[in-house]
Amino acid sequence: MEQFHGTTIVSVRRGDKVALGGDGQVTLGNIVMKGGAKKVRRIYNNKVLVGFAGGTADAFSLLDRFEAKLEKHQGNLTRAAVELAKDWRTDRMLRRLEAMLITADATTTLVITGNGDVLDPEGGICAIGSGGAYAQAAAKALADNTDLSPREIVEKSLEIAGDMCIYTNHNRVIETIE
């Protein structure tokens, strides 16, 4: 059976502001199944942003588990991410899930990979998904050479990724914490 896949999620942190955005395309094989999916959300009393890429059902399963870990650890993003990663590595069912998450709060941005790794991105910029490399390169160039806000950088990076990646569209959802 073919998998749902393809998306672009990008996060930019600059000073005390962070933005996290994603496109809206859901693809099954070579068919666009949905163009307006919401892959970026606010959770934990709107204090944490999360974006997901990969298999849609897998991503929702991980999102639910991550939200439970945040509740258990009173919103401590790093602790919740590490605990989710531990479960992801040891639980036989979770190990089969094919998804990645970017999470951000007022002070921290983390990438949680399908291997159960928790990564703190260099320079406050990270991206995942099929268009992630395009978006990350664009975000880095914009951050290094302009005074744009994190939201503006995320928006422009997603636009560039949407122009280059066939699994990424121009329907964007962007959330910020300031």
Swiss-Prot record:
One of its GO terms (molecular function) is metal ion binding. Its EC number is 3.4.25.2. Na(+) binds at G162, C165, T168. GO terms for cellular component: HslUV protease complex; proteasome core complex. Keywords: Allosteric enzyme, Cytoplasm, Hydrolase, Metal-binding, Protease, Sodium, Threonine protease. InterPro entries: ATP-dep_Prtase_HsIV_su (IPR022281), Ntn_hydrolases_N (IPR029055), Proteasome_sua/b (IPR001353), Proteasome_suB-type (IPR023333). Gene3D superfamilies: Glutamine Phosphoribosylpyrophosphate, subunit 1, domain 1. GO terms for biological process: proteolysis involved in protein catabolic process. Transmembrane segments: none annotated. It catalyses: ATP-dependent cleavage of peptide bonds with broad specificity. Belongs to the peptidase T1B family. HslV subfamily. This is ATP-dependent protease subunit HslV. It comes from Paraburkholderia phymatum (strain DSM 17167 / CIP 108236 / LMG 21445 / STM815) (Burkholderia phymatum). The lineage of its organism: Bacteria, Pseudomonadati, Pseudomonadota, Betaproteobacteria, Burkholderiales.
